[in-house]
Amino acid sequence: MLELSKIHNLRREYISKQFRRSNLTKNPMHLFSKWLYEAYCQIPDPNAMCLSTVDHTGQPFQRLVLLKYFNDKTIVFFTHLNSRKAIHINNNPKISLCFPWNIINRQIIITGSVYKISKKEAQKYFYTRPKNNQISTWASKQSTIISSKKVLKNKFLKLKKKYFQKSVPFPHFWVGYKININSMEFWQGGIYRLHDRFLYKKNKKKWYINRLSP
């Protein structure tokens, strides 16, 4: 077991390739695509991102969700319409995302507002999922209290039997969200804590870039 007295000594030097302005792209999503591919080649779950939302009192909440689609303008994730995150988004669509690729000394932070994609788009993605995953979506009322894991498993097995030779119906509560991106910050660890940070901010459809002090 790690002794609490030793936690303050947990540190390492971040040794990375140079990250300069000349490495940047005009559209931050092009750099995002490059970094995502490099993360994919080196770490598990590179599409896992920490989504931050706030409730009606201003209390922030965070959780990992999976990036499922992106293009030159946006990124997309999916969830239950009745989940805690979706309820927060319904009240306040402003969110923040973080891709925590600390294993390769990188991090990307994204801010913006989200809006629902069409039912047709959500349905298209839903049916790319493995059938057992489709069934588990029906079995779980996300974020609600359950008495035990057994209750959830029994419901799943009952539904699995029901849809053994049938298609799983599309859940009316399954929703996808697109992000209208306002800013993207690319961070790369540097030796002696001289990290590199570049912030893209959008103003009237144009991206402006600034280097930030670490």
UniProtKB/Swiss-Prot annotation:
Cofactor: FMN
Domain of life (superkingdom): Bacteria
Gene3D superfamilies, A to Z: Electron Transport, Fmn-binding Protein, Chain A (2.30.110.10)
Catalytic activity of the protein: pyridoxamine 5'-phosphate + O2 + H2O = pyridoxal 5'-phosphate + H2O2 + NH4(+); pyridoxine 5'-phosphate + O2 = pyridoxal 5'-phosphate + H2O2
GO BP of this protein: pyridoxine biosynthetic process
Entry EC number(s): 1.4.3.5
UniProt-annotated binding residues for substrate: R11, R12, E13, Y14, K68, Y125, R129, R193, L194, H195
GO-annotated molecular function: FMN binding; pyridoxamine phosphate oxidase activity
Pathway: Cofactor metabolism; pyridoxal 5'-phosphate salvage; pyridoxal 5'-phosphate from pyridoxamine 5'-phosphate: step 1/1; Cofactor metabolism; pyridoxal 5'-phosphate salvage; pyridoxal 5'-phosphate from pyridoxine 5'-phosphate: step 1/1
Cofactor: binding details: Binds 1 FMN per subunit.
Keyword vocabulary terms for this entry: Flavoprotein, FMN, Oxidoreductase, Pyridoxine biosynthesis
Residues involved in FMN binding: 63-68, 78-79, 84-85, 107, 142-143, 187, 197
Similarity-based family: Belongs to the pyridoxamine 5'-phosphate oxidase family.
Quaternary structure annotation from Swiss-Prot or TrEMBL: Homodimer.
Function: Catalyzes the oxidation of either pyridoxine 5'-phosphate (PNP) or pyridoxamine 5'-phosphate (PMP) into pyridoxal 5'-phosphate (PLP).
Protein name (record): Pyridoxine/pyridoxamine 5'-phosphate oxidase
Record organism: Blochmanniella floridana
